[in-house]
């Protein structure tokens, strides 16, 4: 595969895979996007992108957002090993904020880059189970 490939192994493809990541609390929110990250063991990093028509009516906009996500994921993939990353569009881009395609692309890229920087940070470990402490007056 080429240097810029986005192989199937690097994608979240099945409903169960998406659901397992969605079940977690969002790691970070930006003005327009939500980031979810889940540890996936020693497997390579995988990306899922959810861009609904409710928030991006035109296919051109949805495709531009997906391309930006895939490119930023590709650049940071070595830092994301062992994680499933899911990006979801959560709000519309008001027309007055993005008068041109270049402005739309710039805003998307800036927000997504910030989210991917958060995704590369170490994941917080789940709290370790502590053994129950004996109470005063109880016999072990």
Swiss-Prot record:
Keywords assigned by UniProt, alphabetized: Endonuclease, Hydrolase, Nuclease, RNA-binding, tRNA processing
Q: What is its EC number?
A: 3.1.26.5
Q: Which GO terms describe its molecular function?
A: 3'-tRNA processing endoribonuclease activity; ribonuclease P activity; tRNA binding
Highest rank taxon of the organism: Bacteria
What is its EC class?
hydrolase
The Gene Ontology biological process annotation of the record reads: tRNA 5'-leader removal
Name any GO cellular component annotation. Answer: ribonuclease P complex
Catalytic activity entry: Endonucleolytic cleavage of RNA, removing 5'-extranucleotides from tRNA precursor
In terms of NCBIfam families, this protein maps to:
rnpA
Instruction: Name the protein family.
Output: Belongs to the RnpA family.
Q: What does this protein do?
A: RNaseP catalyzes the removal of the 5'-leader sequence from pre-tRNA to produce the mature 5'-terminus. It can also cleave other RNA substrates such as 4.5S RNA. The protein component plays an auxiliary but essential role in vivo by binding to the 5'-leader sequence and broadening the substrate specificity of the ribozyme.
**What is this protein's name?**
Ribonuclease P protein component
Source species of the chain:
Ralstonia pickettii (strain 12J)
